[in-house]
Amino acid sequence: LSRLVLYKRPEMNNPITVVGFGGWADAGNVSTLSLAYLRESEGAIELGRLETSDLIDHTQHRPIVTIEGGFIREIRMPGWEIHYAMRKDADLILVSGYELSHGWDQFIRALFELMDTFGSRTLVTIGGLIDRTPHTRPVRLSFLTTSKRLYGKCMALGLNPSNYRGPASMHSYIIHNSGLKGLEAVSLWGHVPTYLNIPNPRVVLAVLEKLSSILEISLSLERLYVDAAVFDSKVNSLVESDEDLKEIVRSLEQEYDEQERNRVSYID
């Protein structure tokens, strides 16, 4: 039985599928905020859903209840929503929800069914991770991919190829299976300062700027530039008023600068 439910079947132009979700790999809300911003800025329209409620840990991602005058009016279960945006260069399919506690293989089948239905051959996931990086330096971004072409683009843009061994998120599972299916796929990760695990529009902006460059699509990021500037101003004021925090930032700046000096540049 398919977990994909479509409300409509529009004709799409070379659609790119972008996936983001809350959970373990959403530091700074980078993943969820990126998808929310794309839905709003692109005027995305509801396309369907993935029936995954039974695969979500409801103690971690609880249903939303509406109670009025002592009566329950609605209980809305968490799930996965699908939106689409029609564009001049390439259409977007936006898939968002919460990391599943199990049944990842069922999710992948539904996701690939969605992509096959609309002829999407390119997939992007967006994640956020906590890192020893200061907010006063350029946002550090890393990636993993299935494609030598996308690898070259990411390296040329200054992104760091991921090196990691440990518990996997759904991102890795999605990218791995995309490679097995022969899709061009890339997972972009925004690095969030250890002392700032709060909604971070600055990192979201950096991720979406690079997404635009890697895939050669235009994105409207004007509001994010404003949000990031306001965020920076507030964080700078906070740091200036806290000597301990100021020392943490100084130490991370030195560490960041040393790593950048020792970094090997990439020539495509």
Regions found by a protein language model. Name each.
Residues 48-54, 122-127, 222-225:
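A generic structural motif
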Residues 29-33, 102, 106, 165, ...:
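Conserved active-site and cofactor/substrate-binding residues in soluble primary-metabolism enzymes
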Residues 132-214:
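Catalytic cores of processing enzymes, dominated by hydrolases/peptidases
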Residues 90, 98-149:
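Internal, conserved structured core segments that host functional sites
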Residues 1-99:
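N-terminal short beta-loop-beta anion/metal-coordinating cradle
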Residues 196-268:
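A conserved C-terminal secondary-structure "cap"
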